[in-house]
């Protein structure tokens, strides 16, 4: 986890991860028999540069265990997964806890898989469930060939 979730939403939720956690200092990309995969945690998905770093490091998929709350979940959950998938032409997989209205922190839920075209392949609701979806890495390659966003980047123009 590189980015700590410290928020105070007016008429919404207050939460400060920095009270108990220390942020990481690098992106995590690892080798598997299917290719490289990345992992980011929850709030990290809100930083496009972090997903881009993983994609440029060769990640074919990024796994995101996350627990968006009842304020940010409805507004941003699906949107951020679709945007990171589309921006990087990569599969994004979000795993979220089921909603428990009796808990101190109430999660939005809605585990999700998005494809490199930015399409939601499958999404659960707020209840307990298991999300199973077949990932086609050849489709990722085809999308990157047809619309070569990463190759067309002009990194010399960007101030990151």
What spans do the regions from the language model cover?
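A short C-terminal boundary segment appended to hydrolase-like catalytic domains
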Residues: 138-160
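Short, well-ordered beta-strand micro-motif
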Residues: 29-31, 113, 132-134
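Active-site catalytic loop in hydrolytic enzyme cores
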Residues: 1-57, 70-79, 147-149
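Short, solvent-exposed coil/turn elements at secondary-structure transition points
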Residues: 2-5, 98, 117, 136
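Short, functionally important structural connectors and interaction interfaces within domains
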Residues: 13, 22, 37, 116, ...
């Amino acid at each position: 986890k590189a980015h700590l979730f410290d928020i105070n939403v007016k008429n919404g939720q207050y939460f400060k991860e920095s009270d108990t956690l220390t942020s990481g200092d690098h992106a995590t990309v690892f080798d598997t028999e299917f290719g490289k995969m990345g992992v980011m945690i929850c709030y990290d998905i809100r930083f496009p540069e972090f997903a881009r770093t993983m994609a440029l490091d060769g990640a074919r998929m990024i796994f995101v265990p996350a627990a968006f709350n009842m304020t940010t979940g409805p507004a941003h959950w699906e949107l951020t997964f679709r945007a990171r998938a589309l921006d990087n032409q990569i599969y994004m997989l979000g795993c979220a806890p089921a909603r428990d209205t009796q808990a101190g922190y109430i999660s939005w839920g809605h585990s999700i898989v998005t494809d490199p075209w930015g399409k939601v392949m499958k999404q659960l609701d707020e209840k307990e469930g298991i999300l199973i979806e077949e990932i086609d890495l050849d489709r990722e390659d085809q999308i990157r060939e047809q619309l070569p966003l990463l190759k067309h980047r002009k990194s010399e123009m960007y101030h990151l």
